[in-house]
Amino acid sequence: MAAAASGAGAGAAQEKQFPPALLSFFIYNPRFGPREGEEENKILFYYPNEVEKNEKIRNVGLCEAIVQFTRTFSPSKPAKSLHTQKNRQFFNEPEENFWMVMVVRNPIIEKQSKDGKPVVEYQEEELLDKVYSSVLQQCYSMYKLFNGTFLRAMEDGGVKLLKERLEKFFHRYLQTLHLQSCDLLDIFGGISFFPLDKMTYLKIQSFINRMEESLSIVKYTAFLYNDQLIWSGLEQDDMRILYKYLTTSLFPRHIEPELAGRDSPIRAEMPGNLQHYGRFLTGPLNLNDPEAKCRFPKIFVNTDDTYEALHLIVYKAMSAAVCFMIDASIQPTLDFCRRLDSIVGPQLTVLASDICEQFNINKRMSGSEKEPQFKFIYFNHMNLAEKSTVHMRKTPSVSLTSVHPDLMKILGDINSDFTRVDEDEEIIVKAMSDYWVVGKKSDQRELYVILNQKNANLIEVNEEVKKLCATQFNNIFFLD
């Protein structure tokens, strides 16, 4: 349990804050143990595993009862969450009769009473349902990306195989959940796109076409620069979850000092090879080692339709990364990897350098303004484009936001209001800290702005937001 001292004044040292924490996470299917004495068969995965068997059965039984009870009132949409003083339970049925449940402990403030005994206060209203329901859905999407559906595991090897896959995946994945840093971006699950001029975009398009022609077994390609997406041949929903995996898991594991020029040591091991910075992030570590293993992660896409299994090859040069996806029935050889390296490496290095140069020119032209008076989050539901100046960096372990958590909660509350109505609308809130928070929903797009202008009035705030829309989103139509 991590605690942080907070507060001001005399009692500050006595007050401790504990962020939300994962208490339990389980997956069950009520059809697998319908008779008395067979209840344990329903449980497919349970964390923490040390929990005594009868308690597991009791907790799953309680969830079943809650779902059944809420079905009475809403047959098509049963329980999504249950609020109690100490925790919040979230329910998700991603496939028929397969239920996932996540129990999160509410944040705690521990104070010292007059007689010196600790008094625990649960912050019942701090957690946002939509944020943690989205986190639970992400858990399933990430499992499905690397393992396929629950049903497919049942078809391939019955309950035994499904349990093995769930254990193997979630045992590791749950350790990467950092519930204290989840926020509005988890609801959107969007993709940050890299801003590019037409000429450079065409160069990238032409590079992808050349690569797909040279490496004919490549089925899909995705191109990223600086952890932002430029091009993808995958369906949106598949790219969205692959993007999350790349930016929060794979890339952070391979962080390298950005190459500032061409003065770093250049790889030129292979005779006649053009000098380049390319390397595999998945697959063989050393292409010169004849024993090198060419194992690539397997991913599953289009699971509702054609159900494709693919090998994921991620290759990087400087800040540019390309994902090549090939049919899983084809096993890439070391020769193929060497060929890919010799074709892609030099061209990707030059391209990465071009993008960097172009980006710096554009940056200089737009001029580095002083710290603006506002921060914003933008999301487009149609193409999943997301942009945030609120987040300095979103890493797997921490979401570094440059604003107070109270303001992040207001953003979440505004988003919940937007969900309840279909019409376009605007909400303006003045926070206790004198910040102004504005939410705009217009034509499948959402914009959230935080303004640091204590003495501004409503009209002035409205004008500021209009100015922001004109400068940052000049080609996007926002209804007034």
Swiss-Prot record:
GO terms for molecular function: guanyl-nucleotide exchange factor activity. Its main location: membrane. Keywords: Acetylation, Guanine-nucleotide releasing factor, Lysosome, Membrane, Phosphoprotein. GO terms for biological process: vesicle-mediated transport. The modification Phosphoserine is found at S74, S264. It holds the Pfam family Intu_longin_1. GO terms for cellular component: intracellular membrane-bounded organelle; lysosomal membrane; Mon1-Ccz1 complex. It is found in: Lysosome membrane. Acts in concert with MON1A, as a guanine exchange factor (GEF) for RAB7, promotes the exchange of GDP to GTP, converting it from an inactive GDP-bound form into an active GTP-bound form. Interacts with MON1A. Found in a complex with RMC1, CCZ1, MON1A and MON1B. This is Vacuolar fusion protein CCZ1 homolog.
